[in-house]
């Protein structure tokens, strides 16, 4: 057993292409010819005619030797005889009784093997007789094992099976799963495989029926695989049943016709299901024919689909290394030399150039074909791979191979870079471009001295764009289009809203920009004139981008710019942080000092609590403690606001702001303190302006008086100057009277935006100050009053007044926040309707 197992061989490609025959002239009469030679010539002619009748492609038939032609001819005749009997539906027909009607009907049918049906199977069809001969194998066996259909038909199946699985396969071929139990006729040994093959034939009466469940088979064994470079075997699952093989007409030793014998009809599928990508690529295995120097001379139909070249385009370019990536040339050359020495290269993975200048990973196996004992040409079988598989093979290869020019690591060894200047990753350029011309001249001269069959010459003949294409596909596109479109759109935006005397200048600039960018201002047909064959145009065409698309992109960009061009950006206006910080600090101090503000004790204002006497007493005590302090601070605030020359500082009222700002407010009786403070009339010099303002003698709760915040980052610019006291006298009584007219109805609640830069509870004072401008002029003019409308005005009117240098009117957008007073107040005067409805309440800061 050991001696026999030592000589076990597996199936391999052993075919040799037959010698091409040439028709020789018939010798003249009288000249004797060799009878044996005439016999050989006659035999070769018959074999060629027999090979032409085989149902195989012509490229397969041309590679068959004489024994293979005879073997396949016998197999074809046996298969044809089987189908002639098996396609008959009744047992009577199988015994030779034929129905004329059915025969005529079947003659009209052209029953052929469906190619799509075989591709739909996740495996291949295999029929094995009980004496271990492959009766039939479908053509899809090549996709899984790498063997041609003609390689395995009518060969021993044990040449394909792993040695450890051969006994199990033999057991599955027996109807009782016990091949050791043999009848009286004995066994014969297969010396090559070390297995006993039964030489006995069973009578159908001795075995179970054909449709019995005991005839079903499902098992796993390993088959020889030429496509697997790890172990060389592929685990396959065989699922089928034992059936009778009809129409073989075998005879026994006594010359009697034997009954049909059993055979295994099964579908072999890989034990591990292939991925979707493997299923997609398995049907694209193609073959190419090359000279000994790897110059392509032919390609099959699938190769033309994968690579995109016609056979003429593939053969006219010279060396096949021009289609190989520069980083894979030395790798392929190494296996090329190995193939010349050993006859087969083995499995290698590299990149091939397609017609659309893309690289595709392939797994190839090349072998030599001999003629008259000498190498004649090369047949390469390639299988497309995915980018992930190719990258993984490249990573494994880099761990073994030395440094190469293509990776830039040859600089470590001071080796001259063989790349042309455009492929150099670090080209040396001069300002006048002379260096580029010199290098191009040198590269042209170097090509003349290169060996035409060398790898360097093949690489120099490659187009540089195949290496630069992925990296440079977007650079020129963005540079020529997006940068210019931004400049054009910016000029267009300036032309939309010209102001003042700048119209002529801006129109001139737009005209100049259109002259400098004729590709964008004119029709798209003018883009890149006479450059339809340029690299940029080819890149755009490959990406599916046309000049119409670029025109639409520009129109879309201009459309969106038009929608937002009317909105002014208030963030461009500088904010005077110094003034706002001062106002905020002073107001916060007075708020905390006078009202005793405690956030934890805040509660909503209740009108019913305004009549409680104990709250009034508490407010009286608080006002007495801070009367003088507020008066001094209010004077400072007025002086500060005098130089602002504004009527209001914030822009938006909001009535829907969440998060109230709760701050206790003192009662409106606090304004009586000005009559008690000495020197008040001298400290508030605003008598004349306040006297001109009508008011009403009514007070309402002041819980609404807060500073309205400016909305959404609106920034205002105020002049900064020295703070000087104004020369206008005033009295505390007039100030108190003016405060009363600034009150709003109790039902209105205003909130404070937490993002506001200024927060203060000093409602009445700040309202009195900000209602009119504090201008140090001799003539006291009455300021125009505007009706309170918190929803209509917007930031545009405020900005127009600010840009034109005019007086800032009291117009604010509608944003109001709510603030609650924790201490209810009492009315000094009955709450009545405001007699002056046109008085704006936007004076509240």
Curated annotation (Swiss-Prot):
Region of interest called Disordered, as start-end residue ranges on this chain: 1-39, 820-845
Motif Nuclear localization signal 1 location, chain numbering: 13-16
Residue ranges constituting the bHLH domain according to the UniProt record: 27-80
Composition-biased stretches (Polar residues): 1-10
Motif Nuclear export signal, residue range(s) on this chain: 64-72
Boundaries of every PAS domain copy: 110-180, 274-341
Single Gene Ontology BP annotation: response to toxic substance
Propeptide residues according to the Swiss-Prot or TrEMBL record: 1-10
Region (Required for maintaining the overall integrity of the AHR:ARNT heterodimer and its transcriptional activity) location: 50-82, 117-125, 265-267
GO cellular component, one term: cytoplasm
Subunit structure: Homodimer. Heterodimer; efficient DNA binding requires dimerization with another bHLH protein. Interacts with ARNT; the heterodimer ARNT:AHR binds to core DNA sequence 5'-TGCGTG-3' within the dioxin response element (DRE) of target gene promoters and activates their transcription. Binds MYBBP1A. Interacts with coactivators including SRC-1, RIP140 and NOCA7, and with the corepressor SMRT. Interacts with NEDD8 and IVNS1ABP. Interacts with BMAL1. Interacts with HSP90AB1. Interacts with TIPARP; leading to mono-ADP-ribosylation of AHR and subsequent inhibition of AHR.
Protein name per the record: Aryl hydrocarbon receptor
